[in-house]
Amino acid sequence: MVLKELPTLTARLTELRVDARLRSFTAAEAPRFTRALEPAHVLSPEALAAYAVAYHYIWTLLLPYWWMESHDTFFLFAQSPDGWFMPLLPLGPAPLEQSVGEAFELMHQWNGPSPVSRIENVMEPQKQELERGGFRCRQKGGDYLYKAEALAALAGDHYKSQRALCNRVEREHLVTIEPYRASDHSGCLTLCDRWAIQKRGGTLDSMGQLLLEDAKVAHDRVFVEYDRVGLSGTVARRHGEIVAYTFGYWLTPQTYCVLLEVADRSISGLAQFLFRETCRAASTRGALYINAMDDADLPGLRAAKLAYRPTAVLDNWVVMGR
């Protein structure tokens, strides 16, 4: 999640277009973004969750995103308080070294000598190619990838605790799972507020607090525009009240990404139950893998994701220039 690197996450920036070719990134660009993925050859089981439009679009009320095309290649830029950067590689048929070089030329024009110029969410094959071309890279936290079948079943001793929590929800609470509908908007917002209060009552570090402050804005955008950017949602109800929700998207026909998940923390095991049901539904629809994204450098989230025994933590690199 790129926002964790910003000094003030909730800054509302004045949109300043520094190049006439730049256009504001909206949901209308979703088809264009998707078309650009194929010739870029970046989608595979090891692809990062960032190579989907929803991953970026939900944050555009907090951080202006801009796009442009050059040599039939799609460039996506984010305008942070510190300057301009790219949240993912240029997408298109142009040679990677050429398009990345062009991207850094533009960012250096806009940012001057500032080290903020960078390209995030670069995968291992592209990183190796760019290093051969003289580009410098540094590693950042990667996405957690799981076998969908394993998370749907939660079989064996390795998943004993998660399975017990799911069983407790089934035994003690009458929870129903339903697809998200537009009429669920208000109930999900109410839950989001309650969840944020519960989280603040726990042990959050300063970064966790900052991420939480921006969550409501991003989640509210999802509730309203989910279908415009390829998201599907699920809600859990108890006695008619929404007590959990989750949204995700298909990164590839074999990989389902869990974009966000919120569960009432007063119901023990509810988060684990919802995650299992999400994985079951994805597996039924053909998913071989579940991408649960990164851990945002939060120790608690890292421990929770490792407890599900990922098959891989996908390499994720930042290109810093030559």
Question: Which residues fall in each region the model found?
Answer:
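Short, polar loop motifs at secondary-structure junctions
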Residues: 120-127, 162-165, 296-297
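Amide-forming acyltransferase catalytic core, primarily the GNAT-like/NAT-type
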Residues: 2-73, 77-78
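Short catalytic-loop micro-motif centered on adjacent basic/acidic residues
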Residues: 116-118, 178, 288-292
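Active-site/acyl-donor-binding loops of N-acyltransferases
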Residues: 2-17, 136-155, 289-322
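Conserved donor-binding loop and adjoining core beta-sheet/short helix segment
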Residues: 48-118, 122, 237-265
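Short, conserved active-site entrance elements at the starts or edges of catalytic domains
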Residues: 190-241
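Acyltransferase donor/substrate-recognition loop-hinge adjacent to the catalytic core
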Residues: 6, 132-209
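Aromatic (often tryptophan-rich) hydrophobic motifs at membrane interfaces
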Residues: 230-322
